[in-house]
Amino acid sequence: MSTSVPSALRIEGLGLQIGGATILKDVELDVAAGSLVGVIGPNGAGKTTLFNVVSGLMKPTSGRVLMNGDDITSASVPARARAGLGRTFQTSSLFPRLSVLENVRLAAQVSLGGDYSLLRFPRRSDAATRLALTKLEAVGLTHKLETAAGDISHGDKRKLEIAVLLVTKASIVLLDEPMAGVGSGDVAGLVENIRDMQRESGCTVLMVEHHIDVLMGLVEKVAVMYFGTIIAYDTPQNIMNDPLVQSAYLGTAAA
């Protein structure tokens, strides 16, 4: 008797229009819990916009977004975060003047029941500090605890963002171009950090990435976006051999 893995994230008929322009059109996606899924497509295909809608930064014109079976289409950004949705952006979302440790400790304090007010943030909370140090050790940043987040490399910033996600215990994680700006020598380590995050927490990961070779070696399935819709969703091997996908990247696929 076979058993199917429940959906962590389900997108049904999602559409977005802005000023009469169609940005997303009939997007359908079913992401199994605990899976690691890549999202690829040409520039302007709608990948980041899709993440913006899923994370609540933009409201769709039509369709639904379900998280673990619950309709979150109208939920606020904080409500989605409380439900377990985490995200990184193409540009850093860290507090640049706070140290590496303070960035993660702040997130840890919130995870332990505090809030994001820096005025009320207990800088020496033992529980938050222990949690932060554990996650910083996991991503290999304990040697930069007192360095300002704005002063570390792009690769280390990505690692720091993963440490923040780990302390928030996000069950669904959206990674928007995590390799952007990362030096070639740091890519392999960051890939391992993403794998470790997924294994350790059991979270579901969706990842937009232009480094196709890196992505294909990391994910279990790939969704291909083209002109605001998903034209293919399959294993990396099948995606690479799909004529429709190949023509989309050559610019000849039907919209």
Regions flagged by a language model, labelled:
Residues S2-A255:
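Glycine-rich phosphate-binding loops of nucleotide-dependent enzymes
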